[in-house]
Amino acid sequence: MPALSSRLRRKHPSLTPRPGAGPRQRSAPARTAGTAVEAGTARVVGTAAEVGTPSIAGTPGVAGTATEAGTVDRSSLLRPRQAVRWRRRLVPGPADREVLWLYLLTRAGIWATAYCTRWLFPDDRKTPHVADLFAPWQQWDWGHFLHIARDGYFPGQAGPWMNGWDNREAFFPGFPLVLRAVHTVVPHWATAGLLISFVSGAVAVLALARVARLYLPDGNAGRRAVLFLLLSPCAIFLAAGYTEALFLALALPAWLAAHRQNWPCLLYTALACLACTVRVSGLFLVAALAVHFALTVRTRRQWRALPWLALPALAPLVYSWYLHLHTGDWMAWKHAQERGWYRDFHAPWEAWQNTWHAAFEESLPTGYALMSQAELLAMVVGILLAGVLARQRRWPEAVYVGLSLWALGTSYWYTSIPRATLLWWPLWILLAGWSLRTPRFTTMYLCLTAPLMTVFAVTFLSGRWAG
């Protein structure tokens, strides 16, 4: 029997008692930093028991409570750890502060550009009077957002059945609703819009840096991705009262939460739902999250979270229902885009051909022709990006970029694709990875894109079409 007993111990180590684990030790209740057990354990006061034993997990006063049966309350053990984890996520660390410093520097540069543009490019070149401080920012789509926030979508029974209608229902209600809310505190409309983009941009760059650190191990990856975004050609639209900054401030944290949390999680579905109220691109985000869900779930219990992915689609559905009540058209926002911006469906090759004609056949004024050339270049960049993502088997990101390209590349001609590059966060992470492997890449990128960013900024701030 002794030989048999030793063999059993070797095969089943759990059957072998630990040294010193006698009956007294096994029956003793766990020492905790919570309340005392009624079964004769030492009374706990403050951070440790009076008998001089440390609390569980080595942190005084945070390690849970002991139950009457001598077991530890696991929920109370996890709560402090979760609090620390959330504190680390919400409180900016040193790397986050570097990102925010970079963000503030670029904002100062853009505002300096706006100041100079206001003096150098007035509407009347011979006027001695300078325009209002906020005049350069009140261009193009800003007027639609202002009218929606101030007057609503259908003021005074006006609508698409009237001549000269501005097709404002083409714009989703997320940004105008936030603008109206901020306006209750900040009376000046333009200031309220700029403040929204300023705060949203800060949230977006912090989230982008953290997403980049999920993909790239280098500590400089996040700051490098943010640098490439903030100095990209169309970065002016992150500072203006437009939807790009607000959308990224919702979409990037949703993407980050989807990668960090276990399924199910209401956080990223709620953020994605809010993103869908800002831009139709939110639906592309939902599709990417669905692909990510399908590739990462492992258990039947996790699959039960699948219906939650339908929650973000409620936002466009509710907006379509609202438009239907006023117009009788469930797709009124899409038809408004077709009337105002030629976004009726065309085959991709037809859209390319029409844009090429506008860019090089001298059929449009030179400013519009140059922006058409930028549209073609942005489409090429998007196709290459989608191809690289597919080759790397990053299917969720490839779906997100691919759907964006399909939506933008099937109109009569290309419109606002350079602006859409701001929303392609896989592009900035990919460029950051290349720059970390090839140090000269950063210098090359900055030398090429910084002048283009200035050109786009001056174009927009002076009231010309900038995509």
Residue ranges and their predicted role:
Residues 191-192, 209-231, 395-399:
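Transmembrane-helix signature of polytopic, membrane-embedded enzymes
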Residues 136-155, 161-186, 348-355:
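Short hydrophobic/aromatic helix or loop-helix immediately within or flanking a transmembrane segment
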Residues 310-313, 437-467:
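Signature aromatic-anchored transmembrane alpha helix within multi-pass, membrane-resident enzymes
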Residues 230, 237, 251-258, 265-293, ...:
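Membrane-interface alpha helices of multi-pass inner-membrane proteins
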Residues 240-246, 417:
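Short acidic/glycine- and proline-prone juxtamembrane loop motifs at membrane-interface regions
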Residues 163-164, 169, 173, 177, ...:
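Loop-to-helix entry region of an early transmembrane alpha helix in multi-pass inner-membrane enzymes
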Residues 181, 195-215, 381-385:
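Transmembrane-helix motifs of polytopic, lipid-linked glycan transferases
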